[in-house]
């Protein structure tokens, strides 16, 4: 005769910290009346640092798109926000990317560089 045993309770799923978000939208501050203020980012943890991959920005309206001027780096052709040190948390990277977007918005309107 076989004895039946109750199914073992599976371990609860382990919660791991997210390493990537889906696309997130930020509407930059604009003091010049520009209509297009939409920026889209995908945040991803790479190694020990968070990155803000740039999915969309408004047109630069003829301003120089150079990576050094617009503070962008590239990972396999995908642009992300350049920052001078590792970023430990998603929240910090979101704050940095908003700062970046607000400064790009000013650059588009006036040509004023930042950094």
Please state what every model-predicted region is:
Residues 66-115:
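Domain-level detector for trafficking modules
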Residues 17-85:
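Compact alpha/beta protein-protein interaction domains typified by the UBC
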Residues 5, 35-38, 99, 115:
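Long, contiguous binding/interaction regions
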Residues 1-19:
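Charge-rich, low-complexity N-terminal segments
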């Amino acid at each position: 005769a076989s004895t039946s045993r109750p199914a073992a309770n599976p371990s609860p799923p382990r919660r791991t910290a997210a390493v990537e978000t889906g696309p997130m939208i930020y509407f930059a501050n604009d003091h010049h009346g520009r209509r297009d203020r939409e920026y889209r980012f995908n945040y991803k943890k790479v190694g020990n640092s968070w990155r803000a991959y740039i999915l969309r920005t408004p047109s630069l309206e003829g301003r120089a798109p150079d990576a050094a001027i617009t503070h962008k780096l590239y990972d396999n052709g995908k642009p992300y926000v350049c920052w001078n040190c590792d970023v430990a948390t998603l929240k910090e990277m979101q704050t940095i990317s908003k700062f970046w977007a607000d400064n790009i918005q000013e650059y588009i309107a006036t040509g004023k560089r930042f950094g």
